[in-house]
């Protein structure tokens, strides 16, 4: 009937499929393919680069500081779903946002405390 039932943990190379793997970055970070499907906790600038991610990839950014951080674009269109603009943006203190990659050249960001 197409259903799969499992007793125990279902995992892949990044860990338990019911959890979002977390990495912590304390310096500026450029998103790379290995970041797909993860949460990046940071207090520093994030750069979203073109040609790094595949169709359907997603990365969540958690600003774990009391100040805004900058999310820059580099050779990619990054559309803020709050206003529809293709722009660099900021992520406010303790904010969280997810970036969805439509393809290698276009991504969408949505979340709390996004600015421009």
Kindly give the residue locations of the regions a language model identified.
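Terminal beta-strand-rich extracellular "head" domains
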Residues: 75-91
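Parallel beta-helix/beta-solenoid repeats that form elongated, surface-exposed shafts/blades used
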Residues: 1-2, 6-15, 87-89
């Amino acid at each position: 009937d197409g259903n799969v039932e499992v007793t125990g943990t279902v995992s892949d190379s990044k860990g338990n499929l019911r959890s979002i793997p977390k990495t912590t970055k304390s310096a500026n970070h450029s998103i790379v393919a290995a970041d797909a499907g993860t949460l990046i906790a940071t207090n520093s600038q994030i750069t979203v680069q073109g040609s790094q991610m595949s169709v359907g990839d997603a990365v969540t950014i958690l600003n774990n500081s009391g100040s805004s951080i900058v999310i820059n674009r580099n050779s990619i269109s990054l559309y803020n779903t709050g206003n529809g603009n293709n722009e660099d943006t900021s992520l406010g203190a303790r904010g969280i946002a997810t970036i969805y990659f439509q393809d290698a050249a276009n991504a969408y960001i949505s979340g709390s405390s996004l600015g421009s």
